């Protein structure tokens, strides 16, 4: 017989029935969700616990769309923690926008933004959502370091806004709230990347 996870508890390192601790439960391999197997998930409960964006982020990041995902509440919790990191980063960016530094031309930021936009646009068209999630992690790492460079307010706000718009299909609630906090509420259009800014500038140095 199939047993619901809610009917099981851990006692002295063993998984047993809550109703009768003398009966040990055998855990089988991962199965597809089915009411008869009592392994379905209540989406409302998960969304209430972690938020819709975290659930969406987990589902899209787990595997390519043509493959089945392996449901994991630990995975959703990890996605939720990452979104919290994005919120912390957003607060730092808002603070930098308000202070309006003027020490960096923003060349690295502009180039990164347009490369990011190309990645997101191309992978949305290819339904490669897991690649998009990886790009969002790269964006987080980039901004976490670059925020110290003290860009001008306009440069930082303009490029960060483009990035927020581009990630709306993946984490819409987060992106929309961030745009509202930046007072961007009208005429939101999909950002286009500049091909000229995708090129890397290399200098050949003769070694003697």
Residue ranges and their predicted role:
Residues 43-208:
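Helix-rich, typically C-terminal accessory recognition domains appended to large enzymatic cores
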Residues 2-52, 66-77, 196:
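Conserved phosphate-binding loops in nucleotide/dinucleotide-binding enzymes
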